[in-house]
């Protein structure tokens, strides 16, 4: 009998979900041949190779990473049978336009779901995900970690991947000290996610091979905390699934992929930022919950800001630096730094655009909705340097850092800086603590 022809696959990604889907579904599957990955969202990832050490025995030369812009050309030149969509925080319309492009070039278009991609853990998994980037996952994850620790559990966090460097050195990364961040040459985006855990004395894992990461984390954890990325769904099967929504972007919970998946599957839905959102917009989110997930437990919360030196802001001309991804593909116009500038009486929030250099200029061209905010873009050493130069060139009295990471750890700034932090605070009932206690009481894995 003639050997069955392998299906030729192209995976559309952004150096995260795509690698995971490959590892768990395609890597050892002889029925498929993954011809290439494509890249978008993250600067400078196309042109790399997914290395043979990670790609497995079927791929002795590794797998190339090309630009998504060339999708139709790749489908035709390489006789692609199946295009697999594998990244997040995009509108449903964006996904379907890609599907139409794939179909018009002759290929099938797939979305792999939880059954094909979620790994099972021997330990209980609490997952924190969101409907969009910038909803408040980070402070929610921190709060969940703190509450579980106070209940006496050893919690280990595992963060959705951000593999921007040499993938071979990043198979399994364990962060317990600030030195570990330097050891793995972390970008600003990575530091923003890992530092808050380290500051709390916690261990956080990340990397490329999430099966290996899980098995390492299980050795030292009572409970695994999945800290999601963008609005993606978890890589691990959750025993408790918490999803954060944002009433500043009402309706997005049903319009963005795969955030709607999270929203529909959630055990607990947090409506965050209710202290700063419009009442009608909060109501729209509530109506969405009633419509598609009426059995979810709903918690209302605020994310109040705390500033280390508010006296430096009053009456000053300030440069506001905000979390990069929230403003770029998250689509927000401002973040915590802007709120702090207004709240503490800055005389003026300066326009950083005239002072931008290098790739920061390109960021403003790509995201024209940004005006008086400087997004903390730092996907590599060169970009971090360009961000530092932009900040130092800016004609301002003070820098307000609305970023989760303290930029002064790895930048020399020529003006005083104020750091803004934000924590999750529930409003009314139920509280997260009660929800977690009730869950822990009934969790079979914790009884073992």
From Swiss-Prot:
<dbReference type="GO" id="GO:0005524">
    <property type="term" value="F:ATP binding"/>
</dbReference>
<comment type="pathway">
    <text>Amino-acid degradation; L-arginine degradation.</text>
</comment>
<comment type="subunit">
    <text>Probably forms homotetramers and higher assemblies of tetramers.</text>
</comment>
<dbReference type="Pfam" id="PF02492">
    <property type="entry name" value="cobW"/>
</dbReference>
<keyword id="KW-0547">Nucleotide-binding</keyword>
<protein>
    <recommendedName>
        <fullName>Arginine synthetase ArcE</fullName>
        <ecNumber>6.3.-.-</ecNumber>
    </recommendedName>
</protein>
<dbReference type="GO" id="GO:0016874">
    <property type="term" value="F:ligase activity"/>
</dbReference>
<comment type="pathway">
    <text>Amino-acid biosynthesis; L-proline biosynthesis.</text>
</comment>
<keyword id="KW-0460">Magnesium</keyword>
<dbReference type="GO" id="GO:0008652">
    <property type="term" value="P:amino acid biosynthetic process"/>
</dbReference>
<keyword id="KW-0436">Ligase</keyword>
<dbReference type="InterPro" id="IPR053199">
    <property type="entry name" value="cDPG_synthetase-like"/>
</dbReference>
<keyword id="KW-0028">Amino-acid biosynthesis</keyword>
<dbReference type="InterPro" id="IPR003495">
    <property type="entry name" value="CobW/HypB/UreG_nucleotide-bd"/>
</dbReference>
<comment type="function">
    <text>Arginine deiminase involved in an arginine synthetase pathway, which provides citrulline and ornithine, the precursors for proline biosynthesis. Catalyzes the conversion of L-arginine to citrulline while conserving the energy of arginine deimination to generate ATP from ADP and free phosphate. Is specific toward L-arginine and cannot use D-arginine, agmatine, guanidine, L-alanine-L-arginine dipeptide and L-arginine-L-alanine dipeptide. Can also use CDP, GDP or UDP, with lower activity (38%, 8.4% and 13.3%, respectively).</text>
</comment>
<keyword id="KW-0067">ATP-binding</keyword>
<dbReference type="InterPro" id="IPR027417">
    <property type="entry name" value="P-loop_NTPase"/>
</dbReference>
